[in-house]
């Protein structure tokens, strides 16, 4: 059975093999949008767990896990967007957005895996 990463790679390959540039762009954009929706769900779960941890650890002086994760997420989104739009997408061309959306989808999927790592293993 293929792994999660292999299935993702297969999705991207399917998009890149679409017959027209327009179809490739639509396909990679959909991959990105689906990854963002999944990341939002995972982020909500992580924030709920962080809030529970904050409640258990109140008064410990450790600071808020929820606030740290929220700040980390904002910084990560800035990094992802800059990396994909300004680095991968540099140079233009008709296929630029196919590569940008592919990059955005890939980095978002990577972030989902990171967010799914339990707190005590980070």
Regions inferred by a protein language model and the residue ranges of each:
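N-terminal alpha-helical modules
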Residues: 4-122
């Amino acid at each position: 059975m293929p792994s999660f990463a292999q299935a993702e790679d297969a999705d991207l390959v399917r998009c890149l093999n679409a017959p027209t540039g327009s179809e490739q762009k639509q396909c990679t954009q959909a991959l990105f949008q689906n990854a963002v929706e999944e990341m939002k769900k995972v982020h909500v779960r992580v924030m709920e767990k962080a809030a529970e941890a904050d409640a258990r650890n109140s008064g410990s002086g450790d600071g808020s896990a929820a606030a740290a994760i929220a700040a980390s997420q904002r910084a990560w989104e800035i990094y992802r967007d800059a990396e994909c739009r300004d680095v991968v997408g540099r140079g233009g061309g008709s296929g630029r957005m196919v590569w940008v959306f592919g990059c955005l989808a890939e980095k978002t999927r990577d972030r989902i895996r990171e967010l799914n790592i339990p707190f005590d293993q980070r």
